[in-house]
């Protein structure tokens, strides 16, 4: 995937799935991702809403954006978007939770039109580069 393809992917995600946030309860979209660096060291996956257009720079995502820190596009190894994600709010005297659906089938159709290779299953849409 080129930087331009990643930008197209993330812009289509925001258009189809909605605005992302670091907190699932405030997010219309959700994903998990890892990097080649993480795969070679500790195999860590991060999770947050999908980046907004303002989070996308020429070589990667911005610092302090939806993902909280910068990630180079060339280092992204695996991005997973679930069809459904769980959210909760836990505060003193308040507990709310639920799930949100993500129309990954519609996203898949847009990605096909844009020439972005991906995999769609009943549970997830993913881009896996390893």
Segments predicted by a language model, with ranges:
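Structured alpha/beta or helical-core interaction and ligand-binding surfaces enriched in interleaved
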Residues: 1-120, 130
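Minor-groove-contacting beta-hairpin "wing" of winged helix-turn-helix DNA-binding domains
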Residues: 125-129
């Amino acid at each position: 995937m080129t930087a331009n393809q990643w930008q197209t992917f993330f812009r289509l995600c925001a258009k189809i799935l909605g605005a992302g946030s670091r907190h699932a309860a405030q997010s219309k979209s959700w994903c998990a991702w890892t990097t080649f660096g993480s795969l070679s060291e500790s195999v860590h996956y991060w999770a947050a809403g999908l980046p907004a257009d303002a989070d996308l720079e020429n070589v990667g995502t911005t610092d302090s954006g939806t993902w909280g820190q910068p990630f180079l596009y060339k280092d992204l190894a695996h991005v997973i978007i679930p069809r459904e994600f769980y959210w909760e709010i836990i505060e003193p005297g308040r507990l709310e939770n639920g799930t949100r659906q993500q129309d990954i089938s519609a996203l898949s159709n847009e990605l096909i039109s844009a020439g972005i290779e991906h995999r769609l299953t009943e549970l997830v849409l993913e881009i896996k580069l390893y």
